Regions:
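Short alpha-helical segments that sit at the start of domains
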Residues: 1-18, 22, 126
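Short, cationic-aromatic polyanion-contact patches
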Residues: 7-11, 64-82
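Short acidic, hydrophobic short linear motifs in intrinsically disordered regions
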Residues: 25-34
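Short helix-coil junctions and helix-kink-helix linkers
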Residues: 33-41
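Amphipathic alpha-helical dimerization/coiled-coil segments
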Residues: 83-124
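Short, hydrophobic-biased segments on the C-terminal half of alpha helices
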Residues: 47-51
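Glycine-centered, phosphate/nucleic-acid-interacting loop/turn motifs that mediate DNA/RNA or nucleotide
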Residues: 57
Length: 126
């Protein structure tokens, strides 16, 4: 997972998102339509990205009447890897420093902060 996730580009991640959201294998035509609507991508761009992800073993290809594609990595697995990678690369392995940066940023509302406080209180209780 670690080496694979490092190789998934931002554009390839968009393909993965389409498949994660679908929660079912999709033909290339459905993937193309979704990415054309979201990103304005040409069909050849989507086809290239899907092929790359298959080569990286991030997607499986299944022959029916046409090829269907499904992710071999769950969104949760990828998010866990990406979060861990972020913590190690930017915060020298300190999750505390990541949380501190979020708390001091303007990205969290007061409601978000209260929800986090409540979350940590529940986690601390036996």
């Amino acid at each position: 997972m670690e080496k694979l996730a490092e190789k998934i580009s931002d554009s390839e991640l968009e393909v993965m998102r389409v498949l994660w959201e679908a929660d079912a294998p999709l033909p290339i035509s459905d993937i193309r339509v979704a990415l054309q609507q979201r990103k304005g991508w040409e069909p050849t761009t989507t086809k290239t990205l899907v092929q790359r992800l298959c080569n990286k073993q991030a997607l499986a290809q299944e022959k029916r009447n046409v090829f269907y594609y499904r992710p071999l990595i769950s969104q949760e697995e990828y998010q866990a890897w990406a979060t861990n990678d972020l913590i190690h690369r930017l915060y020298r392995g300190s999750a505390r420093n990541l949380v501190a940066a979020l708390v001091h940023s303007d990205k969290l509302s007061n409601d978000d902060l209260q929800e986090l406080r409540d979350y940590f209180k529940v986690e601390d209780e036996p």
